[in-house]
Regions:
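N-terminal charged helix/coil linker that caps or initiates catalytic domains
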Residues: 1-26
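Hydrophobic/small residue at the entry helix of a nucleotide-binding pocket
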Residues: 33
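Conserved S-adenosyl-L-methionine
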Residues: 43-48
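Glycine-rich phosphate-binding loop and adjoining beta1-alpha1-beta2 segment
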Residues: 53-88
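Conserved SAM/SAH-binding loop
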Residues: 98-104
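ADP-ribose/adenylate-binding Rossmann-like module
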Residues: 115-120, 128-158
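A charged, well-structured terminal subsegment
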Residues: 173-203
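Conserved small/polar residues in nucleotide/adenosyl-binding loops
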Residues: 205-211
C-alpha cells in the first residue's frame, strides 16, 4: 500500500521505519544547519520532534536558511519549521521551545529524547548541551563551523579528536577535554575558510558572470 514513507521503507526496511516513527529527536538551533536537519528528519519518518530556538527569521537568513522566506520574516524560526514539518507529515508530533538554551535553565529543555542534534552557535551553550546529554545518556551529534566555506563535498562525520581546519572544533575540543571528555561525534569541514579578499573576489566573479 502506498504511503508517504514507502521509499524509506523500501530502502531501510519495515522495522527501521517503525523505529523512526517512534523516535523523538530534539534539534537545538534552527538556523542554516538546524532548519535543513528538521526537514530531513520530518521527511525521513521521525515521529516526534522538539525544536529549540529563540530567534526570529531575518532578511539576512534568506540566503541559507530553509525557514527563511519573504512571508516568514519576523516569525519565530522554530514555529516556522514546526509548521513545515506538519506540512510534510500531518501525523508528526512536533513541539517548539522558543527559548535560548543555557546552563542555568537547562532542565526545561530536556524530555525523553532518543537523539539530540546540536546546531547551536554559542560555545558555552554548545558545550553545556553536549555535557548534559552525555550525563543523561542521550546520543548527540554537534554541527561545527562552516562559515566562509563553500565545498559541501568536504563535510565529514568524525570524532572531535580527528577534526582539522575548524576553529570552532578546536575550541569545543579544548572545553570538552577540560571536562574530561575526549570523544564526541561531530559534523565538520576541514576546508580552510575564505579570507575577506577571497570573498570579495568571489563576489566580483559572480557579478561579472551575471553581466
Amino acid at each position: 500500500m502506498e504511503h508517504p514513507f514507502l521509499r524509506e521503507e523500501m530502502a531501510l526496511g519495515t522495522a527501521a521505519l517503525e523505529r523512526l516513527s517512534h523516535s523523538h529527536v530534539a534539534v537545538f538551533g534552527i538556523g542554516g544547519v538546524g532548519s535543513f536537519t528538521v526537514e530531513a528528519l520530518a521527511r525521513g519518518g521521525v515521529g516526534q520532534l522538539t525544536l529549540v530556538d529563540n530567534d526570529t527569521v531575518g532578511l539576512t537568513n534568506l540566503n541559507r536558511q530553509l525557514c527563511a522566506l519573504g512571508s516568514t520574516v519576523g516569525m519565530g524560526k522554530a514555529a516556522v519549521m514546526a509548521q513545515r514539518a506538519l506540512d510534510v507529515n500531518p501525523d508528526i508530533d512536533v513541539k517548539c521551545i522558543e527559548g535560548h538554551y543555557e546552563a542555568a535553565d537547562r532542565e526545561r529543555f530536556f524530555g525523553g529524547y532518543d537523539y539530540v542534534v546540536d546546531a547551536i552557535d554559542l560555545v558555552s551553550c554548545k558545550v553545556d548541551l553536549i555535557m548534559s546529554c552525555m550525563e543523561r545518556g542521550i546520543p548527540i551529534v554537534s554541527a561545527l563551523g562552516t562559515g566562509n566555506k563553500k565545498d559541501a563535498s568536504l563535510l565529514r562525520i568524525a570524532d572531535i579528536s580527528k577534526t582539522s581546519g575548524c576553529a570552532l572544533a578546536r575550541v569545543v575540543r579544548r572545553e570538552l577535554r577540560q571536562r574530561g571528555v575526549t570523544h564526541h561525534t561531530v559534523v565538520f569541514s576541514p576546508e580552510e575558510p575564505m579570507e575577506p579578499e577571497q570573498l570579495e573576489a568571489c563576489l566580483l566573479y559572480t557579478s561579472d558572470a551575471a553581466d
